[in-house]
Amino acid sequence: MSVKIRLQRFGKHKKPFYRVVAINSKNSRDGKFLEILGTYEPLLGNINLNTKNIEKWLFYGAVPTLTVKNLINKQNKNNKS
């Protein structure tokens, strides 16, 4: 089973809200997920990620999407400053 870390879209029309989830790569975007790893609100710019659980999934071999990788880097940059 290959696992990806990707975004799941929630919210209303033109008011998106995303969950960062670990999910089987064969499942659909809004399919059954393995674990919720954080949230992202693009309109407010809020990024809340559980870095310990993300590191755990990366250690197990999960592959983050490009967008999730950028969010992780953005949060790490904000935490350092």
Curated annotation (Swiss-Prot):
Domain of life per record: Bacteria
Keywords for the protein's UniProt record, in alphabetical order: Ribonucleoprotein, Ribosomal protein
Keyword hit for Lipoprotein: no
GO CC, any one term: cytoplasm
HAMAP family: Ribosomal_bS16 (MF_00385)
Family: Belongs to the bacterial ribosomal protein bS16 family.
Protein name, UniProt field: Small ribosomal subunit protein bS16
Native organism: Phytoplasma mali (strain AT)
Lineage: Bacteria, Bacillati, Mycoplasmatota, Mollicutes, Acholeplasmatales
Gene name, Swiss-Prot/TrEMBL: rpsP
